[in-house]
Amino acid sequence: MRSVFLAGVALVSALAAQPATAAPDLDLRDNYAHRRCHGGENAGEGLTVGVPGQEAKAIAASQGRVKRSGKVLTLGKVRLKTRMVDGDGDGGEEFEYLGGWARSGLEVVFVLRYEDLAWRLIDPRSGQSIEMGGPPLASPSGKAIAAVGDDSLINEFNGIEIVDYKDGRFESQAIDADYACDPVWLSDEVLQLKVLSPKYRDRNGELLAGELPPSAWRTTKVVRKNGEWTLVAPKP
């Protein structure tokens, strides 16, 4: 009996010594599924926000890093208090915690305002934050975060935005791109995506009449050169 008891104690001790399972890194790639390059008419339908119970699951997976008490969302040094969005100019903001990236220690909160929305990147250790106009996607190391837009959301975000997180600071760079879609990180230095072919605009920059087929988009890349992000010109 003693040997069996000791074996049981050893097993319990071994299980207790195992580290807690880390929460999976936030992955918002499916938020781009309803964009113009896929023939989508309402990009908002593809956003994974406002789903009942979703935030509670994300907070539970944070293993104590993030907490909510009523209208107050706490992420380390950062406290966000919801003010219901009732109308234009009321200053209302609603916050929903989505998850984070263990690789960089950054957290992501969705922000809803009157006729506006954003994704806020937060460093809960320093309290610093920055907002992006589209669903953020982290590079393999988690130190570069990209978002692209095709002017299909209420914030009218159109183009590419890349945020570098270095030495505890956020550095943002905006890149002109027409109806950007389908971002995929190939490495920490290369972001693949699709942009609208220039032949679908006239000399004045206006869109040609008619619907845009999925074939109107061209696959290209954004690459980092000498510390700057540059869009490789797409083929016509």
Q: Where are the regions a protein language model picked out?
A:
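Surface-exposed loop/turn elements that mediate protein-protein interactions on large endomembrane-trafficking
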Residues: S69-D88, Y114-E131, N158-Q173, G205-A233
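Beta-strand C-termini and the immediately following turn/loop, strongest in propeller blades
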Residues: V109-Y114, A147-I154, N158-G159, L193-K199
